């Protein structure tokens, strides 16, 4: 990562921006979520709303994300954790129709939180898309909630391969305390 985003406790995957995806429905809910994260010691929060390139253009997504972030930042009380913008990007062929993918990176870094289909295996094609992000766009993929990908959990060599390419694996904290449930593998 290109800065000190990981210094201190950082929440790198949350749906906290109001009204943009399946996370917080409004600013009040977002502020409650931030208060809980702050009480747990979070110093930085990376807002990662879902971006599906087959459903919305990158420009329209960024406009929605930035508007939601502006609302949230205007309501933040003093002493709140630092807010950074990012996205949870569903990787598909449509993503690469954008010439410039730098806006999907976590603010201040070369990393992007990447989501893959839960029902598909990490095929050679999927690996090649990750390689394209790394080699052609200078983006370090952070593979979101890897515990939900049965194909990676069943084939640790595949995960090792992705990490050897330069990918970073992100897990939800519940994995540290419980075994993945069938819901984690849901399509």
Regions found by a protein language model. Name each.
Residues 1-80:
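An N-terminally biased module of ancient metal coordination in phosphate/nucleic-acid-related enzymes
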Residues 10-12, 46-48, 86, 142-144, ...:
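Active-site neighborhood of phospho(di)ester-bond hydrolases with catalytic His/Asp-centered motifs
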Residues 16-20, 114-115, 170-175:
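Short, basic, glycine/proline-bearing loop/turn elements
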Residues 18, 49, 146, 180-182:
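Proline-centered helix-kink/hinge sites
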Residues 21, 51-53, 118-120, 147-150, ...:
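Short histidine/acidic/glycine/proline-rich micro-motifs that form metal-
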Residues 23, 92, 121, 185-186:
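A broad, structure-centric signal for solvent-exposed, well-ordered loop/edge residues
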Residues 58-169:
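Extended substrate/RNA-proximal surfaces in nucleic-acid metabolism proteins
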Residues 177-187:
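Single conserved hydrophobic/aromatic residue that forms the stacking wall/gate
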